[in-house]
Amino acid sequence: MASTCSGCGPGYKTPLDAMKGPREEIVYLPCIYRNTDIQKPDYLATVDINPQSPNFCKVIHRLPMPNLKDELHHSGWNACSSCFDDPSKRRNRLILPSLISSRIYVVDVGTDPRAPRLHKTVEPTDLFWKCGLANPHTSHCLGSGQIMISTMGDPSGNGKGGFVLLDGETFEVIGNWEQPGDAAPFGYDFWYQPRHNVMISTEWGAPKALGNGFNPADVKAGHYGQRLHVWDWTTHKRIQTLDLGEEGAIPLEVRFLHDPAAAEGFVGCALQSTVFRFYKTPKGDWAAEKVIKVPSKKVEGWALPDMPGLITDILISLDDRFLYFSNWLHGDIRQYDITDRKNPRMVGQVFLGGSVLKDGPVKVLEDKELDSQPTPRILKGKRLYVTTSLYSAWDKQFYPDLIKEGSVMMQIDVNTDTGGLKLNENFLVDFGAEPEGPALAHELRYPGGDCTSDIWL
């Protein structure tokens, strides 16, 4: 969604304007080699997704990082729609935090969008010494021109949910966003809504607990989170904590509605496969309620007798009509109508693989949702892109074949009128065929921004 406004900053004035933007032609994806047998650095892949191009569905450029075992994960921009009113700002640098090494790479995508180049490396010691933080995750551009990055830990691997500020021009570490001593026990994602003077952050777990895989005992030991943290956007103080309980364990991606006047949003909670709605109450504080629950399946031939869906990423359409999320273990993508914010209604579902396959080693003994799957009705609509890798340590644990074969990128055709999802069988990017060996491609970014990178003021 690249801006076409003369004299404007990056992005679009409103989310609805962004929906009218031109079709995407390329995407960027981090590709990971950590936890594979391939001793090569992670890299940024540029993929051609223009159906009219001779390179359609091909990786057209690879930018290797200068170090091994970084664990690239998510990415963000130096400037986005939050800077729309500032014509001096350009969306020309992609920010790549490294989840394990704690490096932050700044990539130049402005000089040649189809052949990105490394612009700067922020070393871990800058985060350690200047901020007392490590394991950076989510990067968001701010209206001030600065870049804010959430963290998951301290330099010793303990949980610590703080925020690093980078200068938007030099990319030097400025310091902490949060007030001294006010970091949350755990960190992961965040989203801000300045009109309500609020930011919400989430919790994954302590880096030393999740660094090499998932152990349920670590949940019982308190090494994973289950809370949302509410921050005063102006004073940078943590003003409220919402404990979601066991059903809200491991709250990952948090999404406010795109309408900057809205005072509500949703968060996907991985362990119990729930979605909570959070909202501002008439009293002016914040509350949360469970609005979606994906039942576990009773199985045999798997690690546990009950298999959760394991909700990972969630996103909201730019018109705030639909919520999408993935069940990483069950293997399906879901679409919910959220026009009734308190009562989301599933209107689309497509299965792409996962741990439950016909003639596979896992046998389903009981599935409470067996008769509730909607039939795809793709009349006209848009596109949803998905990848199969989540995080290399969990990939290795739950999908060992993914380590050997690499991940894939798929396209889902979306009915944005009445709902419906269908796999596009003419689209596939196979990262198992990469020159250095099978790679684990994770989160996508469009050069012009998208519904998880841009925040409107």
UniProtKB/Swiss-Prot annotation:
<dbReference type="InterPro" id="IPR008826">
    <property type="entry name" value="Se-bd"/>
</dbReference>
<keyword id="KW-0963">Cytoplasm</keyword>
<comment type="pathway">
    <text>Organosulfur degradation.</text>
</comment>
<dbReference type="GO" id="GO:0005829">
    <property type="term" value="C:cytosol"/>
</dbReference>
<keyword id="KW-0560">Oxidoreductase</keyword>
<dbReference type="GO" id="GO:0016020">
    <property type="term" value="C:membrane"/>
</dbReference>
<keyword id="KW-0539">Nucleus</keyword>
<keyword id="KW-0813">Transport</keyword>
<dbReference type="GO" id="GO:0008430">
    <property type="term" value="F:selenium binding"/>
</dbReference>
<dbReference type="GO" id="GO:0015031">
    <property type="term" value="P:protein transport"/>
</dbReference>
<dbReference type="GO" id="GO:0018549">
    <property type="term" value="F:methanethiol oxidase activity"/>
</dbReference>
<dbReference type="GO" id="GO:0005634">
    <property type="term" value="C:nucleus"/>
</dbReference>
<comment type="similarity">
    <text>Belongs to the selenium-binding protein family.</text>
</comment>
<keyword id="KW-0472">Membrane</keyword>
<dbReference type="Pfam" id="PF05694">
    <property type="entry name" value="SBP56"/>
</dbReference>
<keyword id="KW-0653">Protein transport</keyword>
<protein>
    <recommendedName>
        <fullName>Methanethiol oxidase</fullName>
        <ecNumber>1.8.3.4</ecNumber>
    </recommendedName>
</protein>
<comment type="function">
    <text>Catalyzes the oxidation of methanethiol, an organosulfur compound known to be produced in substantial amounts by gut bacteria. Selenium-binding protein which may be involved in the sensing of reactive xenobiotics in the cytoplasm. May be involved in intra-Golgi protein transport.</text>
</comment>
<keyword id="KW-0711">Selenium</keyword>
